Amino acid sequence: MKELVIFDLDGTLLNTIADLAISTNYALRRCGFPEHREEEYFHFVGNGITKLFERALPEECRSSDNVSRVRRYFLEYYSVHNTDYTRPYDKVEELLSVLNSHGVKIAVASNKYQAGTQKLIQYFFPGIDFVSVLGQRDGIPVKPAP
């Protein structure tokens, strides 16, 4: 049996797409940019929130200043609303519990920012023992970088 299993968070342990879409649309609206349907966000996510914002912004508006503005409003909203519609996938908590009971170490490595990753793990999996929960941090490349 494996000694350690490392999971991604968004799209693996948790279905976060609705809260990501709503929060990004909030930020886009606050900055005067067009919003997107939730389904479109499946094409925007992956590689961290900076990439999410770059993909959600109109092509001609993808400057670092605009990404920073969208990020600021996104974090303001998402930090309060990141559990509104987010849910664990079926049987995930059961799987994690079984792994814990068999002595398998469990960790999370996510491109979601660190504070958001920790908050969601604590909120949705309070009874699960994770040996490490790592999200996106300044100065550390996002996955899949080593």
Question: Can you say where each PLM-predicted feature lies in the sequence?
Answer:
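Active-site neighborhood of HAD-like aspartate-dependent phosphohydrolases
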Residues: 1-43
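Core-facing hydrophobic residues within beta-strands of well-ordered domains
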Residues: 2, 96, 128-131
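Hydrophobic "anchor" residues on beta-strands that sit immediately upstream
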Residues: 4, 107, 132
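Phosphate- and divalent-cation-binding pockets in alpha/beta enzyme and binding domains
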Residues: 23, 52, 91, 116-119
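Helix-loop "lid/cap" segments that line or gate small-molecule binding pockets
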Residues: 27-28, 48-63, 120
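Metal-dependent phosphoesterase signature
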Residues: 31, 55-94, 102-104
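Substrate-recognition "cap/lid" segment bordering the active-site pocket of phosphatases
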Residues: 84-87, 113-146
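Substrate-recognition element of Asp-dependent hydrolases with the DxDx(T/V) motif
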Residues: 95-122
